[in-house]
């Protein structure tokens, strides 16, 4: 199976089921080629208690993609909010573990589990 690592990144933003929750759902590879829209999204998002980054639709992430995820986490924390990643594939989890990002960013197995952290 050949994985497209330079395709477009789709970003969908919606309110979660739990009040005060924002869900950012990504679909496509998260790479240097397409991180800029996600960076802008993190900078412009509302101040809510919980931001959930749904990576279920992300087949591949490079170091630049990981960097923008960490920056999103830092941005949320700086405003007093929580940041949780869900749908982290084994491939992306391996990247997070290798760089110790898994010790910094909270992860949940499902969207419902992440919303319970609000």
Kindly give the residue locations of the regions a language model identified.
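Short acidic-hydrophobic, aromatic-tinged amphipathic segments that line or gate anion-handling sites
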Residues: 106-110
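STAS-typified acidic loop motif
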Residues: 3-40
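Amphipathic alpha-helical interaction surfaces in cytosolic regulatory modules
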Residues: 29-105
């Amino acid at each position: 199976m050949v994985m497209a690592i330079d395709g477009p990144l789709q970003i969908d933003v919606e309110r979660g089921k739990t009040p005060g929750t924002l869900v950012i759902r990504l679909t496509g590879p998260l790479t240097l080629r397409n991180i800029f829209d996600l960076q802008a999204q993190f900078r412009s998002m509302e101040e809510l208690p919980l931001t959930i980054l749904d990576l279920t639709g992300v087949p591949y992430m490079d170091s630049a993609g990981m960097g923008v995820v960490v920056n999103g986490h830092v941005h949320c924390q700086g405003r007093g909010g929580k940041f949780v990643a869900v749908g982290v594939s084994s491939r992306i989890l391996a990247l997070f573990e290798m760089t110790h990002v898994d010790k910094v960013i909270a992860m949940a197995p499902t969207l419902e589990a992440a919303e319970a952290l609000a």
